[in-house]
From Swiss-Prot:
Cellular component per GO, a single term: cytoplasm
Molecular-function annotations in GO: GTP binding; GTPase activity; magnesium ion binding
Biological-process GO terms, alphabetical: ribosome biogenesis
Binding site for GTP: 166-173, 191-195, 213-216, 283-286, 314-316
Function: An essential GTPase which binds GTP, GDP and possibly (p)ppGpp with moderate affinity, with high nucleotide exchange rates and a fairly low GTP hydrolysis rate. Plays a role in control of the cell cycle, stress response, ribosome biogenesis and in those bacteria that undergo differentiation, in morphogenesis control.
PROSITE patterns, A to Z: G_OBG, GTP1_OBG, OBG
Signal sequence, renumbered to the chain: none
Lineage, opening ranks: Bacteria, Pseudomonadati, Pseudomonadota, Gammaproteobacteria, Enterobacterales
Protein name: GTPase Obg
Occurrences of domain OBG-type G (ranges): 160-333
Residues that bind Mg(2+): 173, 193
The family this protein is said to belong to: Belongs to the TRAFAC class OBG-HflX-like GTPase superfamily. OBG GTPase family.
Amino acid sequence: MKFVDEATILVVAGDGGNGCVSFRREKYIPKGGPDGGDGGDGGDVWLEADENLNTLIDYRFEKSFRAERGQNGQSRDCTGKRGKDVTVKVPVGTRVIDQGTGETMGDMTKHGQRLMVAKGGWHGLGNTRFKSSVNRTPRQKTMGTPGDKRDLQLELMLLADVGMLGMPNAGKSTFIRAVSAAKPKVADYPFTTLVPSLGVVRMDNEKSFVVADIPGLIEGAAEGAGLGIRFLKHLERCRVLLHLIDIDPIDGSDPVENARIIIGELEKYSEKLASKPRWLVFNKIDLMDKAEAEAKAKAIAEALGWEEKFYLISAASQQGVKELCWDVMTFIIENPIVQAEEEQKPEKVEFMWDDYHRQQLEEAEAEAEDDEDWDDDWDEDDEEGVEFIYKR
Protein backbone atom coordinates (compact mmCIF):
# COMPACT_ATOMS: atom_id res chain seq x y z
CA MET A 1 0.00 0.00 0.00
CA LYS A 2 1.23 3.48 -0.84
CA PHE A 3 2.64 5.41 2.12
CA VAL A 4 0.87 8.75 2.64
CA ASP A 5 1.78 10.75 5.73
CA GLU A 6 -0.22 13.96 5.16
CA ALA A 7 -3.89 14.58 4.44
CA THR A 8 -6.47 17.33 4.81
CA ILE A 9 -10.05 16.57 5.81
CA LEU A 10 -13.20 18.56 6.56
CA VAL A 11 -15.14 17.65 9.71
CA VAL A 12 -18.63 19.03 10.32
CA ALA A 13 -20.56 18.33 13.51
CA GLY A 14 -24.34 18.04 13.46
CA ASP A 15 -26.58 21.04 14.13
CA GLY A 16 -28.79 21.00 17.19
CA GLY A 17 -32.47 20.24 16.68
CA ASN A 18 -35.01 23.05 17.08
CA GLY A 19 -37.46 23.30 19.95
CA CYS A 20 -41.16 22.74 19.33
CA VAL A 21 -44.15 25.02 19.97
CA SER A 22 -47.13 22.84 20.83
CA PHE A 23 -50.10 22.79 23.21
CA ARG A 24 -51.82 19.86 24.81
CA ARG A 25 -55.07 18.98 23.06
CA GLU A 26 -57.26 16.29 24.50
CA LYS A 27 -60.94 15.62 24.83
CA TYR A 28 -62.59 17.68 27.58
CA ILE A 29 -59.38 19.70 27.98
CA PRO A 30 -59.92 22.67 25.64
CA LYS A 31 -57.04 24.74 27.01
CA GLY A 32 -54.20 22.37 27.73
CA GLY A 33 -50.83 23.75 28.70
CA PRO A 34 -47.68 23.85 26.55
CA ASP A 35 -46.15 20.50 25.68
CA GLY A 36 -43.51 21.34 23.07
CA GLY A 37 -40.35 19.26 23.54
CA ASP A 38 -36.69 20.19 23.20
CA GLY A 39 -34.64 19.36 20.15
CA GLY A 40 -31.80 16.86 20.19
CA ASP A 41 -28.10 17.74 20.37
CA GLY A 42 -26.09 17.46 17.17
CA GLY A 43 -23.66 14.59 16.73
CA ASP A 44 -19.92 15.04 17.40
CA VAL A 45 -16.96 14.11 15.19
CA TRP A 46 -14.20 12.07 16.86
CA LEU A 47 -10.79 10.82 15.77
CA GLU A 48 -9.66 7.42 17.04
CA ALA A 49 -6.13 6.00 16.85
CA ASP A 50 -5.94 2.52 15.32
CA GLU A 51 -2.73 0.50 15.41
CA ASN A 52 -3.90 -1.54 12.41
CA LEU A 53 -3.52 1.48 10.11
CA ASN A 54 -0.15 2.72 8.86
CA THR A 55 -1.02 5.30 6.20
CA LEU A 56 -3.39 8.21 5.58
CA ILE A 57 -4.03 7.23 1.98
CA ASP A 58 -7.76 6.69 2.60
CA TYR A 59 -8.19 10.39 3.33
CA ARG A 60 -6.74 11.41 -0.02
CA PHE A 61 -10.06 10.28 -1.50
CA GLU A 62 -12.60 10.65 1.31
CA LYS A 63 -12.15 14.18 2.59
CA SER A 64 -15.45 15.10 4.28
CA PHE A 65 -16.99 13.69 7.45
CA ARG A 66 -20.34 14.96 8.74
CA ALA A 67 -22.16 13.99 11.90
CA GLU A 68 -25.93 13.68 12.06
CA ARG A 69 -28.19 16.60 12.89
CA GLY A 70 -30.28 16.45 16.07
CA GLN A 71 -33.98 15.90 15.49
CA ASN A 72 -36.49 18.63 16.26
CA GLY A 73 -38.61 18.45 19.38
CA GLN A 74 -42.19 17.19 19.12
CA SER A 75 -45.47 17.58 20.92
CA ARG A 76 -46.31 15.78 24.16
CA ASP A 77 -42.96 16.90 25.57
CA CYS A 78 -41.07 14.54 23.26
CA THR A 79 -37.38 15.39 23.02
CA GLY A 80 -35.74 15.06 19.63
CA LYS A 81 -33.26 12.25 19.08
CA ARG A 82 -29.59 13.11 19.45
CA GLY A 83 -27.59 13.06 16.23
CA LYS A 84 -25.24 10.11 15.72
CA ASP A 85 -21.53 10.70 16.22
CA VAL A 86 -18.98 10.05 13.49
CA THR A 87 -15.68 8.34 14.32
CA VAL A 88 -12.74 8.71 11.93
CA LYS A 89 -9.94 6.18 12.43
CA VAL A 90 -6.34 7.32 11.94
CA PRO A 91 -2.97 5.59 12.38
CA VAL A 92 -1.25 5.73 15.75
CA GLY A 93 1.22 8.62 15.64
CA THR A 94 -1.07 11.07 13.82
CA ARG A 95 -0.82 14.74 14.76
CA VAL A 96 -4.01 16.79 14.32
CA ILE A 97 -3.75 20.49 13.37
CA ASP A 98 -6.59 22.97 12.92
CA GLN A 99 -5.83 24.69 9.61
CA GLY A 100 -7.90 27.73 10.51
CA THR A 101 -5.95 28.60 13.66
CA GLY A 102 -2.73 26.61 13.22
CA GLU A 103 -3.36 25.08 16.65
CA THR A 104 -2.28 21.52 17.35
CA MET A 105 -5.42 19.85 18.66
CA GLY A 106 -3.72 16.65 19.76
CA ASP A 107 -1.30 13.79 19.12
CA MET A 108 -2.78 10.33 18.68
CA THR A 109 -0.01 8.27 20.28
CA LYS A 110 -1.90 5.33 21.81
CA HIS A 111 -4.15 2.68 20.33
CA GLY A 112 -7.77 3.46 21.07
CA GLN A 113 -7.11 7.09 22.00
CA ARG A 114 -10.04 9.34 21.08
CA LEU A 115 -10.07 13.06 20.34
CA MET A 116 -13.14 15.22 19.74
CA VAL A 117 -12.46 17.51 16.79
CA ALA A 118 -15.94 18.95 16.15
CA LYS A 119 -18.61 19.53 18.79
CA GLY A 120 -22.26 19.09 17.89
CA GLY A 121 -24.67 22.00 18.19
CA TRP A 122 -26.81 22.49 21.30
CA HIS A 123 -30.48 21.60 21.22
CA GLY A 124 -33.19 24.24 21.02
CA LEU A 125 -35.81 24.57 23.75
CA GLY A 126 -39.50 23.82 23.37
CA ASN A 127 -42.17 26.17 24.63
CA THR A 128 -42.68 24.05 27.77
CA ARG A 129 -39.43 25.52 29.07
CA PHE A 130 -40.85 29.05 28.91
CA LYS A 131 -43.94 28.41 31.01
CA SER A 132 -44.16 30.61 34.12
CA SER A 133 -46.68 31.98 36.59
CA VAL A 134 -47.24 35.01 34.39
CA ASN A 135 -47.07 33.29 31.01
CA ARG A 136 -49.19 30.16 30.93
CA THR A 137 -49.29 29.81 27.15
CA PRO A 138 -45.81 30.64 25.89
CA ARG A 139 -45.24 30.54 22.17
CA GLN A 140 -41.49 30.94 22.30
CA LYS A 141 -38.94 28.38 21.31
CA THR A 142 -35.25 28.50 20.57
CA MET A 143 -33.44 27.16 17.55
CA GLY A 144 -30.65 24.65 17.75
CA THR A 145 -27.13 26.03 17.31
CA PRO A 146 -24.85 25.08 14.39
CA GLY A 147 -22.23 22.39 14.93
CA ASP A 148 -18.50 23.02 14.67
CA LYS A 149 -16.89 22.99 11.24
CA ARG A 150 -13.13 22.59 10.81
CA ASP A 151 -10.50 21.86 8.20
CA LEU A 152 -7.95 19.52 9.75
CA GLN A 153 -4.39 18.79 8.68
CA LEU A 154 -3.43 15.21 9.57
CA GLU A 155 0.30 14.48 9.82
CA LEU A 156 1.46 10.93 10.42
CA MET A 157 4.67 10.73 12.45
CA LEU A 158 6.19 7.27 12.85
CA LEU A 159 6.66 5.98 16.39
CA ALA A 160 10.18 4.58 16.61
CA ASP A 161 12.87 4.32 19.28
CA VAL A 162 15.79 4.81 16.90
CA GLY A 163 16.07 7.00 13.82
CA MET A 164 18.57 6.60 10.98
CA LEU A 165 20.37 9.65 9.58
CA GLY A 166 22.78 9.91 6.71
CA MET A 167 23.54 10.93 3.15
CA PRO A 168 22.03 8.93 0.28
CA ASN A 169 23.85 5.60 -0.15
CA ALA A 170 25.31 5.71 3.39
CA GLY A 171 23.95 2.21 4.00
CA LYS A 172 20.88 2.97 6.12
CA SER A 173 18.57 0.55 4.33
CA THR A 174 21.22 -2.16 4.34
CA PHE A 175 21.58 -1.69 8.09
CA ILE A 176 17.85 -1.99 8.77
CA ARG A 177 17.70 -5.12 6.59
CA ALA A 178 20.57 -6.60 8.59
CA VAL A 179 19.07 -6.03 12.04
CA SER A 180 15.34 -6.58 11.39
CA ALA A 181 12.85 -8.37 9.18
CA ALA A 182 12.13 -5.17 7.22
CA LYS A 183 13.13 -5.37 3.57
CA PRO A 184 13.53 -1.86 2.15
CA LYS A 185 14.87 -1.62 -1.38
CA VAL A 186 18.67 -1.56 -1.64
CA ALA A 187 20.55 -0.50 -4.79
CA ASP A 188 23.77 1.25 -5.87
CA TYR A 189 22.21 4.63 -6.68
CA PRO A 190 21.11 7.57 -4.48
CA PHE A 191 17.57 7.91 -3.12
CA THR A 192 16.76 4.23 -3.38
CA THR A 193 14.61 4.79 -0.28
CA LEU A 194 11.66 6.99 -1.22
CA VAL A 195 9.43 6.54 1.83
CA PRO A 196 10.12 5.86 5.52
CA SER A 197 10.17 2.27 6.73
CA LEU A 198 10.13 0.69 10.17
CA GLY A 199 11.94 -2.39 11.43
CA VAL A 200 11.68 -4.21 14.75
CA VAL A 201 15.06 -5.28 16.15
CA ARG A 202 14.60 -8.27 18.48
CA MET A 203 17.57 -8.79 20.78
CA ASP A 204 15.96 -11.70 22.68
CA ASN A 205 12.51 -12.94 23.64
CA GLU A 206 11.84 -9.94 25.88
CA LYS A 207 13.93 -7.08 24.51
CA SER A 208 13.35 -5.26 21.25
CA PHE A 209 13.26 -1.77 19.78
CA VAL A 210 11.92 -0.10 16.64
CA VAL A 211 14.19 1.61 14.12
CA ALA A 212 13.05 4.06 11.43
CA ASP A 213 14.76 4.51 8.08
CA ILE A 214 14.05 7.71 6.13
CA PRO A 215 15.29 8.90 2.71
CA GLY A 216 18.80 10.33 2.75
CA LEU A 217 19.48 14.00 3.34
CA ILE A 218 21.39 16.31 1.03
CA GLU A 219 22.57 19.88 1.35
CA GLY A 220 19.63 22.26 1.27
CA ALA A 221 17.14 19.68 2.56
CA ALA A 222 15.80 22.15 5.14
CA GLU A 223 14.87 24.45 2.24
CA GLY A 224 13.14 21.63 0.39
CA ALA A 225 15.93 20.02 -1.66
CA GLY A 226 15.79 16.26 -2.05
CA LEU A 227 13.31 14.05 -0.24
CA GLY A 228 14.51 14.06 3.35
CA ILE A 229 12.88 17.30 4.51
CA ARG A 230 9.42 15.76 4.08
CA PHE A 231 10.32 12.90 6.38
CA LEU A 232 12.49 14.51 9.05
CA LYS A 233 9.35 14.90 11.17
CA HIS A 234 9.30 11.12 11.58
CA LEU A 235 12.45 11.38 13.71
CA GLU A 236 10.94 13.80 16.23
CA ARG A 237 9.68 11.00 18.47
CA CYS A 238 12.86 8.91 18.33
CA ARG A 239 14.93 8.62 21.50
CA VAL A 240 18.30 8.32 19.77
CA LEU A 241 19.57 9.05 16.26
CA LEU A 242 22.14 6.87 14.53
CA HIS A 243 24.20 9.05 12.18
CA LEU A 244 25.61 6.69 9.54
CA ILE A 245 28.71 7.90 7.73
CA ASP A 246 30.11 6.18 4.66
CA ILE A 247 33.74 5.89 5.71
CA ASP A 248 34.93 5.65 2.09
CA PRO A 249 32.34 7.20 -0.29
CA ILE A 250 32.42 5.72 -3.76
CA ASP A 251 31.82 9.15 -5.29
CA GLY A 252 35.00 10.51 -3.70
CA SER A 253 33.18 13.03 -1.48
CA ASP A 254 34.62 14.11 1.87
CA PRO A 255 33.05 12.16 4.81
CA VAL A 256 33.70 15.11 7.14
CA GLU A 257 31.85 17.53 4.88
CA ASN A 258 29.02 15.00 4.44
CA ALA A 259 28.63 14.71 8.20
CA ARG A 260 28.61 18.49 8.63
CA ILE A 261 25.87 18.81 6.02
CA ILE A 262 23.66 16.40 7.98
CA ILE A 263 24.28 18.23 11.26
CA GLY A 264 23.57 21.58 9.61
CA GLU A 265 20.30 20.38 8.09
CA LEU A 266 19.14 19.07 11.47
CA GLU A 267 19.81 22.42 13.11
CA LYS A 268 18.00 24.30 10.35
CA TYR A 269 14.97 22.05 10.57
CA SER A 270 14.49 21.97 14.34
CA GLU A 271 16.59 22.78 17.39
CA LYS A 272 14.68 20.12 19.30
CA LEU A 273 15.61 17.46 16.75
CA ALA A 274 19.23 18.63 16.63
CA SER A 275 19.50 18.34 20.42
CA LYS A 276 18.46 14.68 20.51
CA PRO A 277 21.13 12.09 21.43
CA ARG A 278 23.08 11.30 18.27
CA TRP A 279 25.58 8.47 17.82
CA LEU A 280 28.29 8.45 15.18
CA VAL A 281 28.40 5.18 13.21
CA PHE A 282 31.00 4.58 10.48
CA ASN A 283 29.71 2.11 7.90
CA LYS A 284 31.34 0.01 5.13
CA ILE A 285 34.53 -0.82 7.05
CA ASP A 286 34.66 -4.10 5.10
CA LEU A 287 36.10 -2.12 2.16
CA MET A 288 39.43 -1.70 3.96
CA ASP A 289 41.49 -3.43 6.64
CA LYS A 290 40.66 -2.89 10.31
CA ALA A 291 43.64 -0.67 11.17
CA GLU A 292 43.01 1.66 8.23
CA ALA A 293 39.31 1.90 9.10
CA GLU A 294 40.05 2.74 12.73
CA ALA A 295 42.58 5.41 11.76
CA LYS A 296 40.27 6.97 9.21
CA ALA A 297 37.29 6.97 11.60
CA LYS A 298 39.38 8.58 14.32
CA ALA A 299 40.54 11.31 11.94
CA ILE A 300 36.96 12.06 10.84
CA ALA A 301 35.74 12.18 14.45
CA GLU A 302 38.54 14.59 15.40
CA ALA A 303 37.75 16.81 12.41
CA LEU A 304 34.13 16.95 13.57
CA GLY A 305 35.14 17.69 17.15
CA TRP A 306 33.50 14.44 18.26
CA GLU A 307 34.67 13.46 21.73
CA GLU A 308 32.20 10.68 22.49
CA LYS A 309 32.28 7.03 21.54
CA PHE A 310 31.84 6.10 17.89
CA TYR A 311 31.15 2.78 16.20
CA LEU A 312 32.72 0.93 13.29
CA ILE A 313 30.37 -1.41 11.44
CA SER A 314 29.70 -3.07 8.14
CA ALA A 315 25.98 -3.47 7.54
CA ALA A 316 26.67 -5.76 4.56
CA SER A 317 28.85 -8.24 6.49
CA GLN A 318 27.30 -7.39 9.91
CA GLN A 319 30.65 -6.58 11.51
CA GLY A 320 30.09 -4.66 14.76
CA VAL A 321 26.32 -4.57 14.21
CA LYS A 322 25.42 -6.77 17.16
CA GLU A 323 27.50 -4.71 19.60
CA LEU A 324 25.87 -1.50 18.34
CA CYS A 325 22.36 -2.95 18.71
CA TRP A 326 23.01 -4.10 22.28
CA ASP A 327 24.33 -0.67 23.21
CA VAL A 328 21.21 0.90 21.70
CA MET A 329 19.03 -1.55 23.65
CA THR A 330 20.83 -0.68 26.89
CA PHE A 331 20.43 3.05 26.21
CA ILE A 332 16.69 2.64 25.60
CA ILE A 333 16.21 0.64 28.81
CA GLU A 334 18.19 3.17 30.86
CA ASN A 335 16.37 6.13 29.30
CA PRO A 336 12.65 5.36 29.32
CA ILE A 337 10.22 7.74 27.69
CA VAL A 338 9.32 10.58 30.03
CA GLN A 339 5.85 11.69 29.12
CA ALA A 340 5.17 15.28 30.06
CA GLU A 341 2.05 15.68 32.10
CA GLU A 342 -0.39 17.28 29.75
CA GLU A 343 -2.96 19.67 31.04
CA GLN A 344 -6.09 17.80 31.92
CA LYS A 345 -8.45 18.94 29.23
CA PRO A 346 -11.92 17.43 29.37
CA GLU A 347 -12.71 15.39 26.31
CA LYS A 348 -16.20 16.83 26.30
CA VAL A 349 -17.08 20.24 27.68
CA GLU A 350 -20.27 20.01 29.67
CA PHE A 351 -22.79 22.84 29.44
CA MET A 352 -26.16 22.93 31.18
CA TRP A 353 -28.91 23.89 28.77
CA ASP A 354 -30.28 26.49 31.17
CA ASP A 355 -26.92 28.29 31.42
CA TYR A 356 -26.62 28.47 27.67
CA HIS A 357 -30.15 29.70 27.03
CA ARG A 358 -30.15 32.04 30.02
CA GLN A 359 -27.30 33.86 28.31
CA GLN A 360 -29.44 34.17 25.18
CA LEU A 361 -32.27 35.72 27.19
CA GLU A 362 -29.92 38.16 28.93
CA GLU A 363 -28.64 39.31 25.55
CA ALA A 364 -32.21 39.70 24.33
CA GLU A 365 -33.07 41.79 27.40
CA ALA A 366 -30.08 44.06 26.82
CA GLU A 367 -31.13 44.63 23.22
CA ALA A 368 -34.69 45.37 24.33
CA GLU A 369 -33.48 48.08 26.70
CA ASP A 370 -31.69 49.78 23.81
CA ASP A 371 -34.63 49.53 21.42
CA GLU A 372 -38.15 50.22 22.70
CA ASP A 373 -39.69 48.83 19.52
CA TRP A 374 -37.76 45.56 19.79
CA ASP A 375 -39.92 42.50 20.28
CA ASP A 376 -38.51 39.04 20.96
CA ASP A 377 -41.84 37.33 20.31
CA TRP A 378 -41.86 34.91 17.39
CA ASP A 379 -45.65 35.17 17.16
CA GLU A 380 -47.17 38.63 16.73
CA ASP A 381 -50.43 37.44 18.32
CA ASP A 382 -48.73 36.47 21.59
CA GLU A 383 -48.88 39.64 23.67
CA GLU A 384 -47.43 37.93 26.72
CA GLY A 385 -44.29 36.71 25.02
CA VAL A 386 -42.10 39.64 25.92
CA GLU A 387 -43.42 39.67 29.46
CA PHE A 388 -41.55 36.44 30.13
CA ILE A 389 -38.24 38.08 29.32
CA TYR A 390 -38.71 40.88 31.80
CA LYS A 391 -40.23 38.84 34.60
CA ARG A 392 -38.35 35.57 34.40
